[in-house]
Swiss-Prot record:
NCBIfam families with a match to the protein in the record: rpmJ_bact
Organism: Buchnera aphidicola subsp. Acyrthosiphon pisum (strain APS)
UniProt-recorded name of the protein: Large ribosomal subunit protein bL36
Gene that specifies this protein: rpmJ
Family from the record: Belongs to the bacterial ribosomal protein bL36 family.
InterPro entries: Ribosomal_bL36 (IPR000473), Ribosomal_bL36_sp (IPR035977)
Amino acid sequence: MKVQASVKVLCRSCKIIKRNNVVRVICSNDPKHKQRQG
């Protein structure tokens, strides 16, 4: 998982989700696209 200041959608299957006031990107297609803002 990458921790980045600004999370970006990298492909079509990436989804932006907000959990516990933390913005995350989850991707079912490519696990390398997982990101967390922080």
